[in-house]
Every structure is written in C-alpha cells, then in structure tokens.
Amino acid sequence: MSAPPAIRFGVYLPQVASSFAEIRDRVLACEAAGIDSVWFMDHLHPPGLPAVPSFEAWTLVCALAPLTSRIRLGHLVLSNSFRHPALLAKMASSLDVISGGRLDLGLGSGSYEPEHRMYGIAYESSAVRARKLAEGLDVVKRLFTEPEVTFDGEFYRLQKAVNVPKPAQKPNPPIWVGGAGGPTLRLAARFADGWNCPTYALGKLDAKLRALAAECEAVGRRPAELRKSIEAVLVTGRDEREVAAARALAERRYPGPGWGLHEGGFIGTPDEIVTRIRELAARGVDTFVFFFSDRARPETIDLFARHVLAGFR
C-alpha cells in the first residue's frame, strides 16, 4: 500500500486594497516560514467591493516569481472566460519555466456575472460555461504535452498549434479544478490533477468527496489519484482571548455563509486547528489553503508556522 500524500499548506492572499510591496512582503514571509504555496484570486474587479486597488492575477504572479525561490504560485481559480485556453497554456508554460517549475494552475468556469457585464465579457449559462471549461481544459492539457495540436470544438478551434517551451513540470503543472457542482466534479475527474473544495461547500465536504469518487470511477480513474484541497478562513491565536478577537475580525471581514467560517471552518487555538486538519486529512484532504483573518500579518504567519505547520513537518 502506498503511503498517504504529504499534507501541504497554502495561504490565500486576495490582492485587494494592498500595495504591491505589502503583497510581496507577505509572500516572502510565507516562503521564509516554510509554507508551501500562495494563491490569488482572478477578478478584474473584486466582487462586491467599491473601486479599491486590485492587481490582475497573472501580472501579479509573474512579478512575484523572480522574487521568490521555493514557494509555489497559483490562483484559486482562474476564470476560463477571461483568456483563450491556447493563450493560457502559453502563459502557464512560460511562467512554469521562468519560476523553475513552481506553478499550480487552478481553473474554473467563471462565476461572477456583474464583473463580466462590467468589462463586456460574455457570460453564458452555467451549462455553456461548463462545456467551454471542458474544452478549455482539454486544449490546455494537450498544448502542455503534445508537439502539435489541432482541435475542432464547439467553442475553440486550433490548427497545428505549437507550444514551446513546454512546462518545466512533467507532464504538466498540477491542474486544479475548483467548484462543487456536479459538472465541475465531472471535469475534475476527467482532466484535473487536483480538486479544490471552495469555502461555500465545506459543510458538504463528505458528500462532495463521495460524488467526486463516483465521477472518478465512472471514467476509470482511482479516486486516490486526484489530490484534494480545501480553502477556508482560519481563525487562531495563542489563547482563547486572542482567538475571540481574531474571530470578531473574521466575522466582519468574511461575513455570511459563503465563506465557510461556520460550515466546517477552522476556528480555535493552534492545537485545535491541528486536530481539525488531521480529521480532514484522514478523509482524504491533502492540501489546506487558508485565508487568515488578518490577511496574513507576519505575527500570524509566524504563529501558524511554529504551532501548526511544525506539527506536520
């Protein structure tokens, strides 16, 4: 029997209302602390917020790649509607080479209709977006691995397209599909190296894992081949008083059920967080991507590294 996959930890750093220097410093602090990855959003305008500064997703990670040396870089998740998949494959291959093989490629169908309207980008029905994502994933994977690609799909067409250089990671950078609906789970089983459970589905994680396993088996794939990650708000402190203060901040910053703060989230002292991680790891989750309630201030990263991360190294 093969050993269970190592548990990996990432930090989600929404690039909103922060200067580039602030984002850079927090990424470097995460790298110094031994955190495995940092993840960013892909929005042209932050959902539900006024006109606050935010950095475009790819521009940001390309700027961070040469400033870092070990930490992995990714997005949860890129919107398939923002970029043609052939262009995305070229961008991803280039960044994977530039970063020395440190890219994780998260891809989804695009979910925020007002943003699409704002920028004049077509926003089709969920069924159409799912079919487009399926074709997009197929195109990206083939351009990562094949010398020449001709593709004649419903939405995308390629004629003897080449993609050189190929990604540094072989056969491709890890591809993550994020979302919790049936069509998304089906696409993860068909195309992805990993599935990401979003915050809003944490309370239904067991049901989603069972559904994902069924989709894997339907395409002749062992469910254990697919990595599983969750993203969640993490609320912690050195003692109960600090936890209460951090929770109050998180309640203001991440209100409502969509953030998963109460639906299976992570609230407690470091020992309680470790216990919760071990519970989910036993159910098959191998990657944990956390939103810190204070947006990953250095002292919080240090606390997490010394009292949570250290328990898994």
List where the protein language model places each region.
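Active-site-adjacent structural elements that line small-molecule/cofactor binding pockets in enzymes
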Residues: 1-313
